[in-house]
């Protein structure tokens, strides 16, 4: 096999791996973004790994973003903006979006944002 074939094959493998990683990273917040859309917002969500936990910040076109903490397959509200999104979603229903993640306010184990998340606000 020629060196050019090996280089092209290697570049293709790296490209496929990067695309899969981007897809997996995006799918982590896709359900959360759809929940915001069902609540009537046009979000822009990003995830952060802080203190061994997965956090999501979803900008909805107002001051501070909605902050969420992933706990198992659900997302706990991290601030009042996120609580407002959850309440609005509960009132409006899922609309055309199916399989939305469970959103909740954790009253037993309150969400405390680490410094890295606070710095993004």
Report each predicted region and the residues it spans.
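Extracytoplasmic/periplasmic/luminal assembly and interaction segments
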Residues: 47-90
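Short, aromatic- and cysteine-enriched interfacial helices/patches
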Residues: 1, 24-25, 117, 121
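Short, non-transmembrane alpha-helical segments in secretory-pathway proteins
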Residues: 20-46
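Residues at the start of alpha-helices and the adjacent loop-to-helix junctions
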Residues: 1-4, 37, 50
């Amino acid at each position: 096999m020629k060196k050019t074939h090996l280089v092209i094959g290697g570049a293709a493998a790296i490209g496929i791996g990067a695309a899969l990683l981007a897809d997996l990273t995006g799918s982590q917040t896709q359900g959360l973004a759809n929940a915001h859309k069902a609540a009537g917002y046009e979000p822009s969500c990003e995830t952060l790994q802080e203190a061994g936990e997965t956090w999501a910040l979803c900008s909805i076109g107002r001051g501070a973003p909605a902050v969420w903490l992933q706990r198992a397959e659900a997302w706990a509200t991290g601030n009042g903006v996120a609580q407002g999104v959850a309440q609005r979603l509960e009132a409006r229903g899922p609309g055309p979006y199916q399989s939305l993640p469970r959103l909740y306010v954790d009253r037993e184990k309150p969400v405390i944002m680490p410094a890295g998340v606070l710095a993004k606000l």
